[in-house]
Amino acid sequence: MEGIKLTLTNLEEFKCEFTLENCDISLANSLRRILLAEIETIAIHNVKVYENTSSLPDEYIAHRLGLIPLNSAKVDDYNYIWNCNCQGECDRCTIHFDLRVSNFTNEVLEVTSLDLKQRQDHTDEDAVRPIKVYSILRDEYGNKREVGIPIIKLSKGQQIHFECEAQKGIGKMHSKWNPVCISTFSVEPEIIFDQEIQNLDIEQKKALVNACPTKVFGINPHTNTLEVQDHMKCMYCEECVYKCAEDFQKPKLIKIDHKKDKFFFKVETTGVMKPVEVLRRGFSTLRQKLDFMREQIQENSNNQFEYGNE
């Protein structure tokens, strides 16, 4: 992975944008898939139901609990349950939560992720707990107001009691372990003019400018030459190419292509990790996979060489 250049262009609490250069599309797509499905996180995996008099069936609530994002900054401190030395579930592989809410009021009570309590209280900010969610409305003092993720609403007299077990996993096992909800990349358009395009008259050039739905082209007011004003707006519809071919009978005036070694990534996390941490783990996983592939290729090559000498 030597020579690859990464430029971080935008960083927010849950989002980041970066440019990846000096690599091909196979590597870029591998990184995209790894960010989606191969970063270790923690999520609720098992749910034990002790009481549920709400209007929703047990499995509906259990499914919602599994999809609540849990802070996974310390995921490395935990083992996979199948790799743990314990006989069952210990603090090294399982985090226990309780959800026990009763509604004794006459109003409808909303149960949220704030009601999901870990059995052992942790003051550490990075402890495994539901991520913090804030309302767009601030309190009377102008401070952010934590509201939690809605789970269910209880009417008067209804109550629920669930025991939840959170474990380590990756998105390949189930999407609830995905650290990101968006991981996409786009390429940089490359628009090439033939020299003959400047021989078009001014009306033809204006028609070509108007043919583009995203207004990629423009006419220089001083020289009356056709120019590419914003190539990043190109969406590869090739309306300009069709215009040249059908109206001007010159199909080769414009060529639409893209750069093969530059990619623009957009990544949005679920909140379980900071975007930069997701990227760091993504590149680390990609390097491990490439190293493993190289070792296997070398091993197979050596075996074939020994077989040939026999």
Swiss-Prot record:
Gene3D superfamilies per UniProt: DNA-directed RNA polymerase, insert domain, RNA polymerase, RBP11-like subunit
Cellular component GO terms, alphabetical: RNA polymerase II, core complex
Keyword line: DNA-directed RNA polymerase, Nucleotidyltransferase, Nucleus, Transcription, Transferase
Major localisation: nucleus
Subcellular location: Nucleus
Highest taxon of source: Eukaryota
Residues spanning the signal sequence: none
InterPro entries named in the record: DNA-dir_RNA_pol_30-40kDasu_CS, DNA-dir_RNA_pol_insert, DNA-dir_RNA_pol_RpoA/D/Rpb3, RBP11-like, RNAP_Rpo3/Rpb3/RPAC1, RNApol_insert_sf, Rpo3/RPB3_RNA_Pol_subunit
GO function terms (MF aspect): DNA binding; DNA-directed RNA polymerase activity; protein dimerization activity
CDD domains according to UniProt: RNAP_II_RPB3
Family matches, as Pfam families: RNA_pol_A_bac (PF01000), RNA_pol_L (PF01193)
GO-annotated biological processes: transcription by RNA polymerase II
The family this protein is said to belong to: Belongs to the archaeal Rpo3/eukaryotic RPB3 RNA polymerase subunit family.
NCBIfam families for the chain: PRK00783.1
Biological role: May be a stage-specific RNA polymerase subunit.
Official protein name in the record: Conjugation stage-specific protein
Lineage, uppermost ranks: Eukaryota, Sar, Alveolata, Ciliophora, Intramacronucleata
